[in-house]
A protein has these predicted regions:
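Terminal or standalone catalytic/regulatory effector modules within metabolic enzymes
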Residues: 1-191
Length: 191
C-alpha cells in the first residue's frame, strides 16, 4: 500500500488522486525493471519528486569512464564527473578498482567541498541482476547499491541495458538521498 509506505517515511499520501498518480508511476517503472521493495531510498526520492519536494543538490553535466590497459591505467578505472552546484561547474577525476569505484571517487571529490557529508558516504554493497535471461550482453540489468554514512544505510536502484549506466543511476540516487538525509538530521539537531 503506497499510502502506508509513504506514511512510514513521513509523507501524507491520503489524497486519493496523489496516491493513484504515485502508484501508476511506480507500476510504470516496475514494468521497466525497477523494484522498490529493497530500495527504500529510491522509493522515497520518487515520492518526493512526485510531490514536488525533490531537492536538487547538483546537476550532472557529463560523466565518462575508462577501464582497462588504456591510458596507463594498468587494469584500474578512471572516471571524470562534471557537475553543477549552485551555478558553479565542478569537474573531477577519480580512480578506482573498477568503473563504479572510479565514478564514486570522482563524485565524492566533486561534492565534498560544498557538501562535506558526501565524504562520509561509503558504498558497502553492489548487486547486479539480469532481468531478461537469454539476451546475453544486451540484457536489461537491475543494480542495487547500499550506501552508508556510518549512521544510516540506504539502498537505491538503477535499471538499463548498460550496467555502468544503471550503476550510475543508482549511485546518483544514493548521493541525492544521502545529502537530503544528512541535511534533515542537521536541521533537526539545530531545531
Amino acid at each position: 500500500n503506497i499510502q502506508l509506505k509513504g506514511g512510514e517515511l513521513g509523507y501524507d499520501l491520503s489524497d486519493a488522486d496523489e496516491a493513484a498518480r504515485i502508484t501508476n508511476l511506480i507500476k510504470e517503472r516496475e514494468a521497466q525493471g525497477y523494484s522498490y521493495e529493497a530500495a527504500d531510498a529510491s522509493f522515497e526520492l520518487l515520492v518526493r519528486e512526485s510531490l514536488g519536494l525533490a531537492e536538487q543538490f547538483f546537476e550532472v553535466l557529463h560523466w565518462r569512464v575508462w577501464t582497462g590497459d588504456e591510458q596507463g591505467l594498468d587494469g584500474d578505472s578512471e572516471a571524470i564527473v562534471k557537475i553543477k552546484i549552485d551555478g558553479e561547474v565542478v569537474k573531477l577525476v577519480g580512480e578506482g578498482f573498477g568503473p563504479l569505484n572510479a565514478l564514486d571517487q570522482a563524485l565524492t571529490g566533486a561534492l565534498k567541498a560544498k557538501y562535506p557529508a558526501a565524504a562520509t558516504f561509503d558504498l558497502v554493497d553492489y548487486r547486479v541482476r539480469i532481468l531478461d535471461q537469454g539476451h546475453g550482453t544486451d540484457a536489461i540489468v537491475r543494480v542495487l547499491i547500499d550506501m552508508t554514512d556510518g549512521v544510516r544505510t540506504w539502498t537505491c536502484v538503477g535499471v538499463g541495458t548498460n550496467v555502468i549506466e544503471a550503476s550510475w543511476e543508482a549511485l546518483y540516487d544514493c548521493y541525492h538521498w544521502g545529502l537530503s538525509d544528512a541535511g534533515s538530521r542537521v536541521a533537526s539537531l539545530a531545531g
